[in-house]
């Protein structure tokens, strides 16, 4: 359809080429539309970009370089064969208008009305830029030998100052002269960096899948992260004082109250294993089950006023006082005197009843085992 764009114009019956010239002339419009609303006055609306920093004289605000305005552009004269243009625009912060003209003689702009320049001018030679060529100075150097002699010393000093800079530029050019080698070296660096980035992305993706954290962005590792991770791995089994106390209580509670002296807390290992060998899974399970059973037994003994049903369940037999060899002394009458008091009966040398019960319970439990 591109070839038909120039043919899809409708020309009405009263259109006359000699009178209207074009469809825009027939409709009384311009090809630039709103930009040419003052074209009869020689004014064209353009987008003007501020060439330097200025101060608005109406609101005293700062307008930075590069700010763009809709400006009215018109031709006001000629400098030799170069036209002089004037730009008029409205401040975007107040009702003030700026008027700026071109100055081809000084390669600059002239601020006519509404604004003032922020003085930040530099000598082109100070900022490593080529300044404007003064043709009169060049012609005077060629025509006046004394004037040229006066400036030879300045040229020599400048050459000595810029010698190091010129050598550096030559070294850079020499280094980049073999473009194939430089390109190969640069591409090799890019390949290594790309490989490293792909490995990092794959490692991060595996970690995100393992932790189920979706598309969370992971930050790169740092030396501080590695140091903290090594400390966590090194001290992960370190326990506090409270942890040691709690483990000691658990070990004591899981220890049988009534046990033989040759029994130990640690589970026995297989006959073929050495003394420092790690117990197998079955041995650890047996030790855990035994510790839980001992805890239940100790808890039943620690409760006061054990019921008869619990005593029967544990295999405890209550013995009478006569069977233990204990003789109960009757109370003396109130009217008896201290001289008539009978001597105290010596208690038989027997072991503690609790030890007897424990011995009996231990024998019964060993038999059950």
Swiss-Prot record:
It comes from the Eukaryota. Residues 233-263, 283-297 have a biased composition (Basic and acidic residues). GO terms for biological process: mRNA splicing, via spliceosome; RNA splicing. Pfam families: Saf4_Yju2 (PF04502). InterPro entries: Saf4/Yju2. Belongs to the CWC16 family. Residues 233-369 are annotated as: Disordered. Residues 266-282, 299-310 have a biased composition (Low complexity). It comes from Caenorhabditis elegans. This is Coiled-coil domain-containing protein 130 homolog. One of its GO terms (cellular component) is post-mRNA release spliceosomal complex. Disulfide bonds: none annotated.
